Amino acid sequence: MKKSLLLLLTALLTVSTLSAQGADVLRRKYSQVSYGKNNFIHGDWKMKSDFAVNFTSGRTFYLHEDEIAGLIRFGIDGTWTDFTYAKYTRPLAVDGKNNDYKFHQVDYALNVGPSVHINPIDDVFVHTYFRYAPAYSLFMGDKQIYGNYATYFVTGLSVSYNFIALGFEGRFGNCDYNNIASAKRIEQFKPNEENVIDERVKHRGWRVYVSFMF
């Protein structure tokens, strides 16, 4: 009986010690899933996405181990995976008939930028960041595929408790798309005009996310 109590006490002390140490460990890696909307702005018209989903994974490189004033840490975020898919629906009248055309956008980006991490109490953190996000963007219609390098910027804010965080971020940028595949010219973008993306496309969007930090 005494041995059992001793083992139980030892186990409780070990768990307590690990928990206390875990609170001081910097959580450097992050993975997040998000849902949002995107605006595709081409010339004088704008198309809003039905939805957009994203998966992001990366790491924070803290510039110092100890908190400044017992409250703030600064870091550099490096995101190795930033994958976004957005779906659009645009009603157009072609040959006197109304049709809903579907469009799909796929982006793969890398991110880098500064971040600020505030620890007001215990395991609660507030994170804010601004990242430069070079990407390759694909935009696909029924018969066309466009693609090119895109320049994005991402800024956001999240609140975490222990290893989980809820956040919101804005995403904006632009892309000069090139037609990289074409099966047939159809009037998807501008009725009665050749189907081309002949101006720089601006992207504006937002997303809410759940993030896991390790």
PLM features: residue spans?
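Outer-membrane beta-barrel channels and translocator barrels
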Residues: 62-67, 119-123, 161-164
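Cleavable N-terminal export/targeting peptides
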Residues: 1-26, 213
